[in-house]
Amino acid sequence: MPAETAPRVILASGSPRRRELLGNLGVPFEVVVSGEAEDSQETDPARLALELGQLKARAVAAQHPDAVVIAADTVVALGGTLLAKPADEAENAAFLRQQSGKTQQVYTGVCVISPAGEQSGVERTDVTFRALTEAEVTFYARSGEGLDKAGGYGIQGVGMALIERVEGDYSNIVGFPLALVLRLLRGAGVSAFGV
C-alpha cells in the first residue's frame, strides 16, 4: 500500500516495549497515550485485559476518529490472583516468591479501532518459573527491572533467567502479542512488513 494511502496508525500506549514491537512490524505509527485510569471491577484476568485494552483504544479513538488506533493491556494471574506492577522492591520480591516454581498466566487484550469499526482479542501464554533461591529473588528485585512490568519481571531482560518454560506466544509476555496484533491491524486495512 503506498504511503500516501496508508491509514494513519496510532499506538495508544506509552510502553517502550509495545513501541519497539509495533515498529518491528514495519508499521508507521505515532504514539498518543490515553491517560485513562485503569479502573475496573472485573476479576477475570482475560476479560480484564480485554476491557482495559478497549478502554484505552476507545479514549484515543474518540480524539482521532479518522485513525486506526491500537491499544493493549497485559494482566498476569497466578492461581486466580492478579499480579499488577509492583509498587516497590519489597512488593517485587514478594511477587517473585509467590511465582517461584509455579505457572502463571499472562493475558494481553488488544483492541483496534478504525473508521470501519472495532476488533479485539485476547492472547494467553503460560509462564513457568524455576524454583528461585532467596538470593535470586533479592538480586532481581534490587535490579529494578521488574518494577514497571505486570508480574514483576521482564522476560526480555535478566528476568528470562527466572523462567523454566513458556507455552504460547513469547511476545505476549512482553505485552504485545504480534500474531494477534498483525491479524487485527490487517483487518483494519493496515499493511505490515513494508508491503
UniProtKB/Swiss-Prot annotation:
Hydrolase as UniProt keyword: yes
GO CC aspect terms: cytoplasm
Superkingdom field: Bacteria
Pfam name, any one: Maf
Cofactor annotation: a divalent metal cation
Catalysis performed (reactions): dTTP + H2O = dTMP + diphosphate + H(+); UTP + H2O = UMP + diphosphate + H(+)
Segments crossing the lipid bilayer: none
GO biological process: nucleotide metabolic process
Marked site: Important for substrate specificity: R17, T74, Q156
Subcellular localization(s) per the UniProt record: Cytoplasm
Keyword field contains Cytoplasm: yes
Keywords, comma-separated and alphabetical: Cytoplasm, Hydrolase, Nucleotide metabolism
InterPro entries to which the protein is assigned, alphabetical: ITPase-like_fam (IPR029001), Maf-like (IPR003697)
Active site per UniProt: D73
Main location: cytoplasm
Broad enzyme group: hydrolase
EC number annotated for this UniProt entry: 3.6.1.9
Cross-referenced HAMAP family: Maf
Entry similarity comment: Belongs to the Maf family. YhdE subfamily.
Function text: Nucleoside triphosphate pyrophosphatase that hydrolyzes dTTP and UTP. May have a dual role in cell division arrest and in preventing the incorporation of modified nucleotides into cellular nucleic acids.
PANTHER family: BIFUNCTIONAL DTTP/UTP PYROPHOSPHATASE/METHYLTRANSFERASE PROTEIN-RELATED, BIFUNCTIONAL DTTP_UTP PYROPHOSPHATASE_METHYLTRANSFERASE PROTEIN-RELATED
UniProt-recorded name of the protein: dTTP/UTP pyrophosphatase
Taxonomic lineage: Bacteria, Thermotogati, Deinococcota, Deinococci, Deinococcales
